[in-house]
């Protein structure tokens, strides 16, 4: 089994910096480190797993793009209402997903 290539969305934030450092420590390949204004759709072909720590307003688009490319997804973004999270989780259920936001 090969090591998955990570796509980190929200790389310039506090958690993004922490995740980049952890990936380096663990020698995990980061295929793309993105932030607001970067092209997630273009970066998806470079990696296997999307880790999203961006803004809650971007979560739906991140899920839609990730599902369309059949990539695994980790969502750490916070600020979603219970109703939003329920709808987004149903959409994300089409691919392997871990939702770690509160």
Model-derived features with residue positions:
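N-terminal Rossmann NAD(P)H-binding glycine-rich loop of SDR-like oxidoreductase domains
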Residues: 8-12, 16-21
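A short, Lys/Arg-enriched amphipathic alpha-helix followed by its capping loop at the start of a domain
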Residues: 21-28
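Extreme N-terminal starter segment of soluble prokaryotic enzymes
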Residues: 2-6
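Rossmann-fold NAD(P)-binding glycine/threonine-rich loop
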Residues: 63-64, 68-69, 77-100
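Short acidic low-complexity segments
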Residues: 34-47
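N-terminal Rossmann-like NAD(P) cofactor-binding module of classical short-chain dehydrogenase/reductase
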Residues: 50-51, 55
């Amino acid at each position: 089994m090969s090591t998955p290539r990570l796509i980190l969305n929200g790389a310039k934030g506090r958690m993004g910096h922490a995740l980049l450092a952890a990936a380096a420590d663990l020698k995990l390949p980061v295929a793309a480190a993105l932030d607001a204004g970067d092209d997630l759709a273009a970066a998806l072909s470079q990696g296997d797993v999307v880790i999203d720590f961006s803004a809650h307003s971007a979560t739906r688009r991140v899920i839609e793009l990730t599902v369309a490319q059949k990539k695994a997804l980790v969502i750490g973004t916070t600020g979603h209402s219970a109703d939003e999270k329920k709808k987004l989780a149903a959409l994300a259920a089409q691919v392997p997903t871990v939702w770690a936001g509160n």
